[in-house]
Amino acid sequence: MTGTRIFDLRRGDYDDNRTSPHGGNIRSLIVTAALEFNYLKASIGFVTLIVAPAIFVGIVPSLVVTYSRLKLGVAVGRNPMVAVLTLAVLAGLAILLGRPFVSKALESFWRLQYTLVFPIFVAAREVVRSIVESLPGKLATVEEIDRGRRFGTIIGGLLLAGGGIGLAVTVVLSYGLQLINVERVQPWVVTRAALLNAVVILGLSTAVESLYWVWRELAARGSVEDWAPLPSGQETPIARVAHLSDLHIVGERYGYRMEAGTRGPRGNGPVRKALQQVLAIDESTALDRIIVTGDVTDAGTRAEWAEFLDLLQDYPLRDRISFVPGNHDVNIVDRNNPGRFDLPWSAGQALRRLRTARALDLIQGDRARIVDRDSGNLGPLLKDYLGESGRADLLRELAEDGTNAGRREMMKVWERIFPLVEAPKRSDPYGLILLDSNARSHFALTNAIGVVSPSQLKALKAVLRNSPPRAWLILLHHAVVEYPVPSISLTDRIGLALVNAPDVLKAITPHASRCLVLHGHRHRDWIGVSRGLLLCSAPSATLGSHGADQYRGSFYIHKITVGAGGSISLITPERVSVFEAADSIGDEVPPL
């Protein structure tokens, strides 16, 4: 083909940089998002995610008062024995019927905490931390950085606690606690009273949570430090693990990635090369596991997951691969429109999780088990759980028709399956615990924030507590500590944070000597230690790491030793570069 030489269609154009702050212009990205933002859907989402749970939380005091008055009313003027029996019946009904109501109220309360309070706390904390780090007298050592950040957390927590108390006191002094009889008032009056009560409850809970975080910082011992390798030859590894992360697989041969745009690689050539390198390394010295810590795909589309599965179709090491989901796998609403808002009940959220669950099933469903929430013991295999009678049919209906029943079932399944556990076999020195650290997001600006749910933390504690003295590799997407360097941007600290990271650390650190945490997300090449817990942060296998290696993909081969009682340690890891000058498919073809 010949024609006027204008540009090469294979090498992208301006449209490939629409969602990239690096390949395009950040100001243009913000303006585009604001113009394409659906304010009607956002308003509906605000009512659903914030206002409705707040009403549910705030109406509890009024319902309690109304029910108490009802019980007292039926008892007055009656025979004492009849009154006692009536009160007993009403109390029994309150316990029987009120339990689901209380459960729903608590669910709404915690939803507000994770949707509103925790992100506000993280933002306040990181703003204060960044101010502290920018003060004269530059923080040079790891200890100084940790001390400055701890001070920033304490100040931020105290400020937020003061704000929460001030908000609650202001509402109480201005309006009083709204205890009304819900039988005799109009719905608007009840709603207004519930919202005012919710503000008081949230203000006080914010103060309590903030003071708790302050206390935890004051009580904490040990800083985040860079890891020091063992002297060469001191120990012999008994396990070799390939740690890849953030593959960002695209669904098009010449497709670019959202974050990098045309500055990054196109197509899936780098992923294919990384897998070939892993295979060559295994042929030289056998690998025990191949771990991928999230962002397997670039936007969680069906085509991207299909590409991933095609890459592994005949891959000899497929049965050694384990992965966890990242925010790009489950939280990208629209890869071409950063202003699009996703309603809580939309099919999109459920479908992205269904695709991820399907890939988990196909790759590791015959060895990963879910945790029984009641006993804390290991339950059925993932493949058996997903295939239980009726469940597979509902999920198939979701995939084919986007049914409401299928959406509800998928959300229940997602809450149920994590953490996944690949228990150590008798001959294995360690097992895997796979966490989902992605907060449920409805908009591009919040898609990268992380949360490990309370139910997951409870199950994680149970597995670590009930397991024999074996070592565990704990996989998640988000970082559990901030890196001990002062140059991290405020947007990264807030927008990429695991908002309840202290809770995750608290669950793991009692077993720190036999745990190794592996994660990705931040595209940073770092290995460290926090309170005796080993932490491995992986660069992106396609987009590299921050600094000189940006867009130069790489991964690690970790050499692990396991001692008595499951104590785990690392030997100097091997860093493998994926980047090559011609890493895109089609470079050998003449330009169009």
What are these regions (language model features)?
Residues 5-53, 60-85, 100-152, 179-307:
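N-terminal active-site segment of His-dependent metallophosphoesterases
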Residues 226-229, 307-458, 541, 554:
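Extended active-site neighborhood of metal-dependent phosphoesterases/phosphodiesterases
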Residues 230-243, 249, 415-434, 468-471, ...:
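Beta-strand-turn-beta hairpins that frame and shape the catalytic cleft
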Residues 243-245, 288-295, 320-327, 435, ...:
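Active-site neighborhood of phospho(di)ester-bond hydrolases with catalytic His/Asp-centered motifs
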Residues 250-253, 298-300, 327-335, 440-443, ...:
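Active-site environment of divalent metal-dependent phosphoester hydrolases
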Residues 313, 484-564:
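Conserved beta-sheet core of the metallophosphoesterase superfamily
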Residues 439-452, 458, 465-515:
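Active-site-proximal segments of metal-dependent phosphoesterases and phosphodiesterases across multiple
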Residues 560-592:
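A short C-terminal boundary segment appended to hydrolase-like catalytic domains
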